[in-house]
Amino acid sequence: MSKENLLLTGSKGFIGKNVIKKLDSLNNFKITKIEKNFYESNDWQNEIDTLIRETNLILHIGADSNTMNKDVQDVMYHNYHLSKFIFDKAKKYNKNIVFSSSAACNGINGYPSNLYGWSKYAAEQYGISNNEKFIALRYFNVYGPGEEHKGIMSSVAYQAYKKKTFRLFPNNPKRDFIFIDDVVNATIFPIFNNIESGIYEVGTGKEESFERVLNLMNINYEYHDESVIPEGYQFKTKADKNNFMKDWQPKVSLEEGIEMYIDYLKANK
């Protein structure tokens, strides 16, 4: 049986690498991988036109995920303009597309509170408005194996494990922490299920404190002064289960995820 052609951007990123690993294990797909340096080619626009024309499905995972990047032109180019180009080509050739968005789109009171959030929000809104076969997945706080290269953008679990101590913001901020395996399964879920075009949330539907994560890891912590809290900082994020894809549910609890992650980190020192 011939394999389906699948185009995946962000092939060297945290989520992209894990998605590829999962798809390779299924052995149903011929995956064309695009990484960031692809766009440095003088002819990348024609090349991607050809790739999209010849593929069956697009997983657009690649992005500038650095929420600390304040360069408007750089962030909007990578997260909006490149996405818009891909979405337009997907529409031209009538291709299904799954777009990796972010809970940063929810921001505060339903609107993004930082540049990264606005760039992803603009991209998903353009995609859903112009493509009939478009699914955006708003990932919440993803952690797990494969995020080692992310540096300051890696999860609190990874950073705390490496430092053996951690400084937290005061006032009890909470996040919806979701294990990478659940995110991978959500990302490929539309491939195997008839999911309507739309914007969906990928989290657990539970908010957990950073203190709880560190306590599960037996990591010591202290607190920053309130004066260092960034403007627009989100103190709570939690996915709305009503916004999950039909029949998709996360399977890994925080306790299970942290245990598996620590085992992985110990084995890969």
Question: Which residues does each predicted region cover?
Answer:
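Glycine-rich NAD(P)-binding loop of the Rossmann-fold in SDR/ketoreductase-type enzymes
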Residues: 73-85, 114, 118-119
